[in-house]
Amino acid sequence: MEFESKPSGLIFAYYSNSLRTQLKLISFTFLLLFLANQKIFAGEFFGEIISTNEEALAFLNSIDQKKENSFWPNIKPDLFYDNLKLNLEKPGSFYPGRSTNFCAYGALSYLVMQKDPLGYVKFMNELYEKGSASFNNNLFKPSKGVMKAAGTLKFKGVLDIRHAEQMWFLVLADKFKGYLNLFHKKFKEGDENTFWAATNLAKFDRMVSKMLGTHVKAVGSDLIKPWVKDPYSYLVKRLGNKVVSLYINNQIIHKKNHDKIKFSIPTHYIILKSITRVDDKITLRYWDYGSDTEMQISAKTLKKIIFGIISIDK
């Protein structure tokens, strides 16, 4: 009997181990399905995303958030990491600040947070810790002037206390250059408001392509409006399978009489979320400066304000 009991014990152990293995495989499968579902849900804006806010928050909560270093002498760790948490909990909260030329970087930030929030947080943490870091194979080694300025910007609204966003906007402006920056390449105090931080259309296209790793196509220019007969129909079609950003003159919108404006230049980048039309009234819903906005204008005014239509592959 003793001899016969040993095989049954071995058989029980075998089946027990086999069951545990199967349960682990089932659990792992459910975990993969859960994460895949999270990414599908999070990817409503982009068809393919790299990471989710949940993954980014888990990483953020796992790191030391009290460390200081000499690379960024004016960055306060509590304000820096609180700002990163805000970016993850409210991805549309990025605020370029009053009177700055950061609006293009704000639009780019919205897109980055839709596609790779974990990459953003890891990049910012490494940049803070080491003074340099790479995002999507783009190496950032900020100048000393920029590193000293981050955390000191004042009278910019809530940007004053958002030290991560100050750092992010400044290093983007320091890294990417266009013809508007040719004579303002080196940062000096107050340059967040000058041509040093300005972004022309080609520079914006290049930033989006490099940071998101996706194809970008634009129509229009910095001075001449796009050769599009019916902007409304064009935008509706583009929104069907692309992410769309607009390069506009938003000062026109605030004029009482649009017909009196004879000359204008583009001043602002927005992320278009939807566009509808009832008779001659066109309603745009878009993101800019930390929130969604709705604007109702005529077809004539729509054509007048748009200088660039940027189509980004999902």
Place the predicted regions along the sequence by residue.
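Bacterial N-terminal signal peptides that target proteins for export
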Residues: 3-27
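Active-site nucleophile-adjacent alpha helix/oxyanion-hole segment immediately C-terminal to the catalytic cysteine
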Residues: 45-184, 237-245, 282
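Active-site signature of cysteine proteases
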Residues: 205-314
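Bacterial N-terminal signal peptides
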Residues: 26-34
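Non-catalytic membrane-recruitment/adaptor modules and adjacent regulatory linkers
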Residues: 157-205, 219-224, 244-250, 282-289, ...
